[in-house]
């Protein structure tokens, strides 16, 4: 008596390999470019920084960079924005601290600003952008709009809260106070007229609030 052969169970088809995610790859390339720009400007300075060097450090082609940015200054601006965003995320900074003690809050933030200005990772790109923005009005406007203006707004918001709480005079000019806090700090950092210290930051707060 012949036996009927058992039908073979069909083998499962091998799982298809997932196709690379273009968006993720683009994000990685973009971040590599920004990191490379920050590293190189600290190593060689802005004048010697080139798109070719950024591309080589990031492991991408020049055209990849030019597809996203028109110039090395534009790359550096976005790199600085990313750096500032990373720092804000790490510190949990969506606003200035509001503990009810205005002087202490402002001193805390200005001391952190002093630390950033004294950190080579921040110093080199910010100096480069400041210099480039002085001769490139469009870049200067973008630098102000995207990096400086949001930071100034945080100070004004904190001062507005203090004014509402009665800690400042009702007619206090919040923009002027903000610039009085940050202007001398930036001047000393940019021109290196004297050491940039926590004591100087504290003195600025005391002077500004003493005249508010």
Model-derived regions, located:
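C-terminal peripheral helix-coil segments that are non-catalytic and often amphipathic
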Residues: 1-20, 104, 108-109, 149, ...
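Key DNA-contact positions within bacterial/archaeal DNA-binding proteins
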Residues: 63
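Tryptophan-centric aromatic hotspots in well-structured domains and transmembrane helices
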Residues: 68-69, 143, 147, 182, ...
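Basic, helix-initiating cap at the start of DNA-binding domains
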Residues: 1-59, 68-74
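Helix-loop "lid/cap" segments that line or gate small-molecule binding pockets
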Residues: 95, 110-117, 126-135, 205-209
């Amino acid at each position: 008596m012949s036996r009927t052969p058992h039908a073979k169970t069909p083998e499962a088809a091998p799982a298809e390999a997932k196709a690379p995610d273009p968006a993720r790859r683009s994000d990685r390339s973009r971040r590599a470019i920004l990191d490379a720009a920050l590293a190189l400007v600290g190593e060689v300075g802005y004048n010697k920084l080139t798109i070719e060097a950024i591309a080589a450090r990031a492991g991408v082609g020049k055209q990849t960079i030019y597809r996203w940015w028109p110039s090395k200054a534009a790359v550096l601006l976005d790199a600085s924005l990313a750096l500032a965003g990373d720092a804000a995320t790490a510190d949990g900074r969506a606003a200035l601290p509001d503990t009810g003690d205005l002087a202490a809050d402002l001193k805390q933030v200005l001391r952190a600003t002093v630390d950033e200005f004294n950190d080579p990772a921040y110093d080199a790109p910010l100096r480069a952008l400041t210099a480039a923005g002085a001769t490139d009005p469009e870049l200067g406007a973008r630098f102000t709009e995207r990096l400086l203006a949001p930071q100034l707004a945080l100070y004004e918001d904190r001062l507005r809260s203090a004014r509402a709480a009665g800690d400042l005079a009702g007619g206090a000019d919040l923009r002027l106070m903000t610039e009085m806090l940050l202007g001398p700090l930036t001047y000393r950092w940019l021109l290196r007229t004297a050491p940039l210290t926590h004591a100087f930051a504290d003195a600025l707060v005391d002077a500004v609030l003493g005249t508010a």
